[in-house]
């Protein structure tokens, strides 16, 4: 399964790192290898393991039939809402930890996901404590 990560700040880079460190365990549980194909960010990351995966146009992800899962880690409502909405409409499963997005547009995104037969998953921690938003 090929995935894309939208945003490569603290959370996005952590997602990529955890996927790489635990790739064997994840592949065993998922029943297939998981590969990060794209990382969407405004910046470049020369000399890093992801430098060849960086893209700047979210539509590349939406239009790629190999991408099954998208992890949104950008934060804020926009452009996250626009990007996530298009991913769901393109038949991609989406996971986010973006509390602002879920609070402002969660009901709408859940409906879009349901209408397109995909999942919109979210979980977050408030104050670094217990996972209270699911």
Task: Please identify what each model-predicted range represents.
Residues 1-89:
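N-terminal glycine-/serine-/threonine-rich beta1-alpha1-beta2 phosphate-ribose binding loop
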Residues 80-90, 97-134:
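Rossmann-fold NAD(P)-binding glycine/threonine-rich loop
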């Amino acid at each position: 399964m090929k995935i894309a990560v939208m945003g490569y700040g603290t959370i996005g880079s952590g997602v990529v790192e955890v996927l790489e460190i635990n790739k064997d365990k994840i592949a065993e549980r998922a029943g297939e290898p998981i590969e990060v194909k794209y990382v969407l960010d405004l910046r470049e990351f020369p000399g890093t393991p992801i430098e060849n995966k960086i893209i700047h146009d979210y539509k590349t992800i939406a239009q790629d039939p190999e991408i099954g899962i998208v992890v949104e880690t950008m934060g804020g409502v926009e452009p996250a809402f626009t990007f996530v909405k298009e991913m769901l409409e393109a038949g991609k499963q989406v996971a986010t930890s973006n509390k602002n997005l879920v609070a402002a547009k969660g009901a709408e995104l859940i409906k879009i996901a349901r209408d397109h037969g995909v999942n919109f998953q979210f979980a977050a921690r408030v104050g670094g404590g217990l996972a209270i938003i699911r």
